[in-house]
Regions:
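Core catalytic alpha/beta fold that binds nucleotide/phospho-ligands
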Residues: 1-121
Length: 121
């Protein structure tokens, strides 16, 4: 689980701009966030999801996991999910992770993400 300040994310994006966005978010995530009525909230929620994933995995952003190895997407019904690439995907395979569930919510100045992982039997 991760809680993030939307105002803090806004300050980071305004200060660092594309340099920060290109380091943390995939091109698809950046396009989606920029189209939202509240783009800073969208960036904040995706950032929280990546942090929550790394915490649920038990490693943080170590062992070579890059921010862009974790992509937040929405299925056709709007349900959020995570798509993994590179080292993040490799570590999940090594650990036998067979399912990842993501919940996102925001209210006022804060966004929260919760990630639950399933391990195969």
């Amino acid at each position: 689980m991760d809680l993030v300040s939307i105002r803090r994310m806004e300050k980071v994006v305004l200060t660092w701009g594309d340099r920060f966005i290109k380091r943390v978010f995939t091109d698809q995530e950046a396009r989606i966030c920029r189209r939202r009525p509240a783009p800073h909230a969208a960036f904040a929620l995706r950032f929280a999801a990546k942090e929550a994933f790394s915490k649920a995995l038990g490693l943080g952003m170590r062992r070579g996991i890059r921010w862009r190895d974790i992509e937040v997407f929405n299925d056709p019904s709007g349900k959020p999910g995570l798509r993994l690439f590179g080292v993040a995907a490799d570590i999940c395979r090594e650990k036998g992770i067979t399912g990842i569930h993501l919940s996102l919510s925001d209210d006022g100045d804060y966004g929260i993400a919760m990630v639950v992982m399933e391990r195969g039997a």
